Amino acid sequence: MAYSSFELLDHSRPILIFGRDGQVGKALQTCLKDLKAPVVFLGRSDCDLSSESSITEVLNRYQPQVIINAAAYTAVDKAEDIAEHDLAFAINAKAPALMARYIANVSHGILVHYSTDYVFADTKQTAYFESDSTGPVDSLCVYGQSKLTGEQAIEEAFNLASDSCHASYQDKFSRYFILRTSWVYGDGGNFIRTMLRLAAERDQLKVVADQVGVPTSAQWLAEIGLQMVGSRVGSGIYHAVPDGETSWHGLAVFAIETAASYGEGIEIRSENIHPIPATEYPLPAKRPYNSRLNNQKLKKALSDMAFTGQYPHWRTQVEQYVIDFVESSLKS
């Protein structure tokens, strides 16, 4: 996808992107390398997202019209430590709230915020719609609670700004897009790379098979976020995942078989990748068993944008990711 311009943007104001060094942040850098508009990528050394004063200083300095928040506290298990609670909530809830309060009062302002399947707590066995109830909060891990609080803070900030605006300024309303996703992989440490490494080192693997979700490409997530920036679709929560579903075990088998078929030095056989229940691999933070997210709302939005690209299946994206990873490994 090409992003040479965005119709409604004031090109004297930069697009501000938090989370430069994460998987989605790196993908955004690739997507925007040829953009004919100012873009500022911020990492931890540029802005302390646990500090209100640091965030406020950055917003006042750059005065962006668009913010893409690809940053998050993602140490899911570490967040269960009482000493980490405040940091998780500062980065995942308070920081997005500050961004939202700022952008909500900018003419044609846009906030893209990436969220997670962890806001759901196994209240159904089919794919969640955006309208489904989240939580209950006491059934979520701390990471999930902090991300849910961030979502709610964004919605509240934009609702307050909308209520305070005169009707004649409706055409200048700012918008927000909360993109919930799951099982992200890209340029960086992730489940797929871990499985490929272990498959090259071991002749037996055990992988959780009773947690189901949708593997999602960071590159595709970056492209979807930018599609929303360039669109006229309405504010709201959108489930940004490809088609299909699988378990962690299913993903591991598919990725390993794909790598083996393309010449990677993997000897492990599929029958030696053993499915296990999550109870056999206990972790401090509770993970959802059902991470399925219904993507029909996003598909409708893309259709309204006259988006002509083919909506992907997770297998297609994972296959290409593994092929690219194998080829880069062979070159190095």
Predicted ranges, named:
Residues F18, L42, A70-A71, L111-D117, ...:
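SDR active-site strand-loop-helix element
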Residues K33-E57:
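Adenosine-cofactor binding site in Rossmann-like domains, unifying the SAM/SAH pocket
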Residues E52-A93:
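NAD(P)H-binding glycine-rich loop region in Rossmannoid oxidoreductase-like domains
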Residues I224, S231-P284, V326-K331:
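Mid/C-terminal beta-alpha module of Rossmann-like enzyme folds, strongest
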